Curated annotation (Swiss-Prot):
<keyword id="KW-0460">Magnesium</keyword>
<dbReference type="InterPro" id="IPR022895">
    <property type="entry name" value="Xni"/>
</dbReference>
<dbReference type="Pfam" id="PF02739">
    <property type="entry name" value="5_3_exonuc_N"/>
</dbReference>
<dbReference type="GO" id="GO:0033567">
    <property type="term" value="P:DNA replication, Okazaki fragment processing"/>
</dbReference>
<dbReference type="GO" id="GO:0008409">
    <property type="term" value="F:5'-3' exonuclease activity"/>
</dbReference>
<dbReference type="InterPro" id="IPR036279">
    <property type="entry name" value="5-3_exonuclease_C_sf"/>
</dbReference>
<feature type="binding site">
    <location>
        <position position="183"/>
    </location>
    <ligand>
        <name>K(+)</name>
    </ligand>
</feature>
<comment type="function">
    <text>Has flap endonuclease activity. During DNA replication, flap endonucleases cleave the 5'-overhanging flap structure that is generated by displacement synthesis when DNA polymerase encounters the 5'-end of a downstream Okazaki fragment.</text>
</comment>
<feature type="binding site">
    <location>
        <position position="172"/>
    </location>
    <ligand>
        <name>K(+)</name>
    </ligand>
</feature>
<keyword id="KW-0479">Metal-binding</keyword>
<feature type="region of interest" description="Interaction with DNA">
    <location>
        <begin position="185"/>
        <end position="190"/>
    </location>
</feature>
<dbReference type="InterPro" id="IPR008918">
    <property type="entry name" value="HhH2"/>
</dbReference>
<dbReference type="GO" id="GO:0003677">
    <property type="term" value="F:DNA binding"/>
</dbReference>
<dbReference type="GO" id="GO:0000287">
    <property type="term" value="F:magnesium ion binding"/>
</dbReference>
<keyword id="KW-0255">Endonuclease</keyword>
<dbReference type="InterPro" id="IPR020045">
    <property type="entry name" value="DNA_polI_H3TH"/>
</dbReference>
<protein>
    <recommendedName>
        <fullName>Flap endonuclease Xni</fullName>
        <ecNumber>3.1.-.-</ecNumber>
    </recommendedName>
</protein>
Length: 262
């Protein structure tokens, strides 16, 4: 069985970069990233590995909602200037890169789902909890910095909803980190309580008459914003990848087919 280690490139690199005292010390960054990748390979023993990078195009999410991720700090100039050399170094280590047009998240999600559907195992290396929506038994998420898998049960307990309701929760309460708006006046706790009672957004919005007038008014007025927020939070899992698995092979394995689903 194929085991694909999928690394969220900038999520890993920027966290490592932030811990380097001298922001111009790209040699130290290269060494630390190389060490991290070597450790990831040693710990997980994948058959395949890829590191996925964000691109420069404006994402479809930002086109849909211009405030999406508004206020995010730009990449530090030394890192921006040294990124290509770092990517080349990783290629020399036989860690293949995949370059997204805009956000890496949708490419990572697509690759993970396609791997799982092909009876393989996908391990996403990222601290971004947005990947927790990929509810498939063959997909897991590894936090390199805490050296542990994402604990879905603990996350469910923290959020107060089941995994299948994570997107509904973000649709109602938003996501401040990504500037996903949600419905004005509906916070995470009240959103979780609503989902405990009504289970899903369609059921909730068809049951507003069962709520108090004030809360029902908020939800009715915010219905379209909830739909927008859901769409912004939901990862795309059906992008055409057009990659050949042999280009990302770590160890000898049986011949692979090309992933090229439209």
């Amino acid at each position: 069985m194929n085991k694909f280690l999928i690394i969220d490139g900038l999520n890993l690199v920027r966290r490592i970069y932030a811990a380097i005292p001298d922001e111009t010390d790209m040699q130290s960054l290269t060494e630390r990233v190389s060490s991290a990748c070597t450790k990831l390979l040693r710990v997980h023993r994948p058959t395949h590995v890829a590191i996925v990078w964000d691109g420069d195009e404006i994402s479809w999410r930002k086109q849909l909602y211009p405030d999406y991720k508004k206020g995010r700090k730009p990449m530090p100039e030394p890192l921006a200037q040294g990124l290509v050399a770092l990517q080349d170094h990783l290629t020399a280590m036989h860690i293949g890169s995949i370059y997204a047009a805009a956000e890496a998240d949708d490419v990572i999600a697509t690759l993970a789902i396609k791997t799982a559907k092909a009876q393989g195992e996908a391990i996403i290396v990222s601290t971004d909890k947005g990947f927790s929506q990929l509810n498939h038994r063959q997909i897991s998420q590894w936090d390199h910095f805490n050296q542990q898998y994402l604990d879905i049960a603990a996350l469910e307990q923290k959020l107060g909803v089941e995994r299948s309701q994570f997107l509904d929760l973000m649709a109602l309460a938003g996501d401040s980190g990504n500037k996903i708006p949600g419905i004005a006046g509906i916070g995470p706790k009240s959103a979780a309580e609503l989902l405990k009672t009504f289970r899903s957004l369609p059921t909730l919005f068809s049951s507003l008459s069962n709520l108090g007038a004030k809360q029902a008014k908020k939800l009715a007025e915010g219905k379209e914003m909830a739909r927008l927020s859901y769409k912004l939070a939901q990862l795309q899992t059906d992008l055409p990848l057009n990659i050949n698995l042999k280009d990302f092979r770590v160890i000898d394995s049986l011949p692979e087919k090309t992933i090229n689903q439209d």
